[in-house]
Amino acid sequence: ERPLCNECFICDRSGDPRCLCEDHVPQCHEGCHQCEKVDTRSGTTMYQCRSFEYYDCANE
């Protein structure tokens, strides 16, 4: 089961809604194939999953 995304950047609604997620999380979900480190203003290390097909759009 894919995790939900609160801040979707681009959604694909051709089937099940899936999106490129803008959420910053303490660690990427184990199923994420493209996890990128994000620099934050607070200095806290956060990550963002950039796998387009991965997240369900929670805010739809």
UniProtKB/Swiss-Prot annotation:
Disulfide bonds: 5-21, 11-19, 28-35, 32-49
Marked site: Reactive bond for trypsin: 13-14
Protein name: Bowman-Birk type proteinase inhibitor C1
Organism: Hyacinthus orientalis (Common hyacinth)
Homology family: Belongs to the Bowman-Birk serine protease inhibitor family.
InterPro entries: Bowman-Birk_prot_inh, Prot_inh_BBI
Alphabetical UniProt keywords: Disulfide bond, Protease inhibitor, Serine protease inhibitor
The UniProt record lists the keyword DNA-binding: no
